[in-house]
Amino acid sequence: MATSKLPVVPGEEENTILMAKERLEALRTAFESGDLPQAASHLQELLASTESIRLEVGVTGESGAGKSSLINALRGLEAEDPGAALTGVMETTMQPSPYPHPQFPDVTLWDLPGAGSPGCPADKYLKQVDFSRYDFFLLVSPRRCGAVETRLAAEILCQGKKFYFVRTKVDEDLAATRTQRPSGFREAAVLQEIRDHCAERLREAGVADPRIFLVSNLSPARYDFPTLVSTWEHDLPSHRRHAGLLSLPDISLEALQKKKAMLQEQVLKTALVLGVIQALPVPGLAAAYDDALLIHSLRGYHRSFGLDDDSLAKLAEQVGKQAGDLRSVIRSPLANEVSPETVLRLYSQSSDGAMRVARAFERGIPVFGTLVAGGISFGAVYTMLQGCLNEMAEDAQRVRIKALEDDEPQPEVSLEVASDNGVEKGGSGEGGGEEAPLSTCRKLGLLLKYILDSWKKHDSEEK
């Protein structure tokens, strides 16, 4: 994710990890002061903030490439519909303009001015549109990939980011070729010629495996437009907490390892939130959130690792195998369905692990053990989610190996994280002397401080 601040789409809140940390800090303060109604309010804000992190997509290319028309087509809008991007024969985009994606409200398509247009000369374009702020790009061209497109592609690569190359107005190319060579005209051959030329130019710019889509914005049902939409949806999973990372293809072992590490942090936060909910004397709050949040989290892990039916079917198609063959190596009890019954069974099996987790945290926060003993479900939730995450990560690795088994042998690399996100695997240490009794609010405040300090330490190490 880009960390620089982008202009906020009017009427929408910009949800970021930083804001989640700020809410968690406010939650800790409310607990320590004993203000339970305020704590409940902050808790609900925290839950909402973890559900979405924005993904900013820059739609770039030269003036007249059809960027605005492509955005409208992707959003299912005509040029005259309310909220449609402005289109025209002259350059209509003078500054970056945001448009929300209809199926993914946390994804914003940014209509960027034309590269090399009078308002954005080539030598100032990258700085003027703040090119580095976008997470992903649609590089749009109305011709067979010239100097403007290769320069933009090289810049995207320099930033370590990805893009789709969208070649627009292929209907005009086909019509012109049909007129010029009526006797030997073959549509498929002309389209392949265009695709090959674009691929060659992009490879010359350093793009090893360019993703090329030939479209007509005026005929979105034809050519590669349906494939562009399905690829787009596949690469933008509904799990929005780590949008940029989670859109990486699951075929990559490195991607699996990164996904597991990121989701492991989410396990700790989810367990914390549910533990806090259990401690709040707010009638009905725990019942309303427990099952729903657990199921939501587990389904998110399931989709993120590509273990759902749609992801398996698409992967099977890509590698020329049957989806059933890939599914056969999945061992997790959540392979078929993440149901309330399955979650309850797994939750009930987590009591032993819960005590180990509680003892581990008790070494860092001596009062934590009494908090767990008082009925807090933190340990059981953490143990269950951690176990499910481990199983799904290993399943994703087995699926990857199965998908590639006809290629070079793939060693089954363990995806275990050494320290379970800071929770050691040993027993509890020797306790000290007697401590003065602390209120539940104070205990929860200490726990939240522990989590915040861990995050701050992690951030400082990354810097």
Swiss-Prot record:
Q: Which domain of life is it from?
A: Eukaryota
For this protein, the record's CDD domains field holds: p47_IIGP_like
PROSITE patterns on file: G_IRG
- Its top-level enzyme class, in one word, is hydrolase
Q: Tell me the segments the record calls region Disordered.
A: 404-437
A Gene Ontology molecular function term for this protein is: GTPase activity
Boundaries of each IRG-type G domain copy? Answer: 53-235
Q: What is an example of a Pfam family matching this protein? A: IIGP
**Which PANTHER family has this protein been placed in?**
INTERFERON-INDUCIBLE GTPASE (PTHR32341), INTERFERON-INDUCIBLE GTPASE 5 (PTHR32341:SF10)
Q: Which family does it belong to?
A: Belongs to the TRAFAC class dynamin-like GTPase superfamily. IRG family.
Annotated protein name in UniProt: Interferon-inducible GTPase 5
Lineage of source species: Eukaryota, Metazoa, Chordata, Craniata, Vertebrata
